[in-house]
Amino acid sequence: MFIDSVKITLASGDGGKGAVSFRREKHVPLGGPDGGDGGNGGDIIFICDNNTHTLVNFKGKRELRAQNGAGGMGRNKNGKKGENLELVVPEGTQVIDAQTNEILLDLTKEGQRELFLKGGKGGLGNTHFKHATNQRPDYAQPGIKGESRLVRLELKLIADVGLVGFPNVGKSTLISVVSNAKPEIANYEFTTLTPKLGLVDVDEYNSFVMTDIPGIIQGASGGKGLGLAFLKHIERTSFLLFVLDPMREMLLKEQFIVLRKELEKFSDELFGRKFGIMISKSDSVNLGEEFAEQIALNINELENYLKEINNPQSFLIKVSSLEKTGLKELKFMLLEEIKALRNNK
């Protein structure tokens, strides 16, 4: 199950209370204080692990608490520190204050370890309060309460290339043939119901990560279809690949215009991201001469429109995932763009 957003209360452990205790030995009837300190409460720690892919482990949990520190004991024995609660999350997880929407943590690197809530300090035992005028103090400190915070965990997948397109245009087929991802593929819309990540090996030394999200429909930025819930997953991609389908009723030019508008409505930053254009199902020209002519006109209209707006795309390529034509060229084009973006960081 793909879970990418949860609301939960997190609390660090309370400090243990200090002990009130006095030495009790056979020949020492009025022994001095020997109360130990309380242990510190456990901390809440986030750990970023790329073997974890969703927030499903947090599903249905309203609160998670670290262990309280143990109380102090006699004979100056300090209480044990409460166990830390280590929360393992996928790369791309943000910890957000549920009330203010402030981003408190941004976990983006494998192995990243962040202290989120510090456990409460243990109270001092009565040993600490002995002085000249009070040789037998009968009080100790209570432990300090741990911290508590209502947060929202949001997962934004991190990938180099994000696929953008309408439902059933060939995005899932593409990612299945160029990467190790195995999405469900069928001839109906919204086959992809959750984001998919795939590692694309270009050659022996170079690879990049591609993500496929559920198809965007007109109005996705306003909440229609599945697009809005998952558009955030391409916010962290370095490069966008628009996948346009010449078999759709909507012309290629119109597909491109609508998709760009939806991105612009969702995020100015996403709209300004570098992108390429892939025309999928290029094998469809084999369906007959008349059909091939229609597709050629369709592509020509798109190319003319792109010229009018000064060719904002990095490249335009025709690909057939079925016949595996254009795939090698596409992978090298994407790698070139990603390398350039990495070098400019």
Curated annotation (Swiss-Prot):
Its cofactor is Mg(2+). It comes from the Bacteria. Keywords: Cytoplasm, GTP-binding, Hydrolase, Magnesium, Metal-binding, Nucleotide-binding. It is found in: Cytoplasm. Pfam families: GTP1_OBG, MMR_HSR1. SUPFAM superfamilies: Obg GTP-binding protein N-terminal domain, P-loop containing nucleoside triphosphate hydrolases. Its main location: cytoplasm. GO terms for biological process: ribosome biogenesis. GTP binds at residues 165-172, 190-194, 212-215, 280-283, 320-322. GO terms for molecular function: GTP binding; GTPase activity; magnesium ion binding. Monomer. An essential GTPase which binds GTP, GDP and possibly (p)ppGpp with moderate affinity, with high nucleotide exchange rates and a fairly low GTP hydrolysis rate. Plays a role in control of the cell cycle, stress response, ribosome biogenesis and in those bacteria that undergo differentiation, in morphogenesis control. This is GTPase Obg. The gene is obg.
